[in-house]
């Protein structure tokens, strides 16, 4: 009898945890859309005066919605996860966000943020990404100058140039980096660990190794024509 009771108790607690996981995942998806609107609009409170019949001036607060100036950088949320910390008093929940930021003109970076709420975690991740931007070379306004491979831990990425009009042929995590960096025609293949965070970091490490013909010529002390020929 005791074993049966324990089984019932375990199954019910498991179902509760499963429901809570589904709930926060839905909330995370909703906040992705809300945070975009919050970034575009700003609510400003102003005080205005109105005259009453008895020559008495009353103040009231008026809310005005003002559009924020758009920045050249755009972001993509790669991953949102709920973090559980077991302490003496029980469990403490927080959220972590992993974001890629770029201006689609050769600058890209990734960032990580952690907070008690999803929007705060995303904002922290965006700030972290903006502080760790790198400049990457873009040839013919569409592709990389040459083939290159890179790795981060057990994740490996190979990037190749593609003809104009081919598009970005890559997985979701690699595609996010390529689009925000400004590439439009790319072949990319990922190997090893397929976790989104490690794949993004491996992609950025690969892009760091890219060099234009002019840069290679300067490093070798040669002319561009000598390298091309």
From Swiss-Prot:
PROSITE patterns: RIBOSOMAL_S5 (PS00585), S5_DSRBD (PS50881). The keyword RNA-binding applies. One of its GO terms (biological process) is translation. Residues 1-27 are annotated as: Disordered. One of its GO terms (cellular component) is small ribosomal subunit. It comes from the Bacteria. Residues 73-136 form the S5 DRBM domain. It holds the Pfam family Ribosomal_S5_C. GO terms for molecular function: rRNA binding; structural constituent of ribosome. Keywords: Ribonucleoprotein, Ribosomal protein, RNA-binding, rRNA-binding. The N-terminal domain interacts with the head of the 30S subunit; the C-terminal domain interacts with the body and contacts protein S4. The interaction surface between S4 and S5 is involved in control of translational fidelity. Part of the 30S ribosomal subunit. Contacts proteins S4 and S8. Belongs to the universal ribosomal protein uS5 family. NCBIfam families: rpsE_bact. With S4 and S12 plays an important role in translational accuracy. Located at the back of the 30S subunit body where it stabilizes the conformation of the head with respect to the body. This is Small ribosomal subunit protein uS5. It comes from Mycoplasmopsis pulmonis (strain UAB CTIP). The lineage of its organism: Bacteria, Bacillati, Mycoplasmatota, Mycoplasmoidales, Metamycoplasmataceae.
